[in-house]
Amino acid sequence: MPLRNTGAAISPFNSFQILQGIETLALRVDRIVENAVKVANFLREHPKVEWVNYAGLPDHPDHALAKKYLGGKVPGLFTFGVKGGRDAGARFQDALQLFTRLVNIGDSKSLATHPASTTHRQLNPEELQKAGVREETVRLSIGIEHIDDLIADLEQALAQV
């Protein structure tokens, strides 16, 4: 089959979209990193949060390595634990309004998932433990939305737990 029949040449609009994405990547990454640090600090201080696992926080065991290898820009993907276990984590996820309930990473939009009730729901507590997933774990992928909106959504969802 000749190459010309496989669609190897993208349209001008698709080329423009790719170029826009590449040109704005640094700005989006900076915003994600900035938002992630603020969200992690907010969660760390919240009374309904049991723990936060984010290498961007100074008390994380790998913080120095993250600073060294990532140039101080720790990505926006991290986990935290909602007090109350599996049911609390599921209720929290269901209450989110701005965060999209999606198992993905690295988007401009903020995403959340509660593995014990989604990707790992078929596992019993012992199997979850073997897989390294706690029942209260929520995974966040932070996006570029305004930080006040992100924190407001997390706050209202935690209030429903």
Regions found by a protein language model. Give the residues of each.
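PLP-dependent enzyme catalytic core of the Aspartate aminotransferase-like
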Residues: 28, 94, 110-161
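Active-site C-terminal subdomain of aminotransferase-like
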Residues: 1-77, 81-110
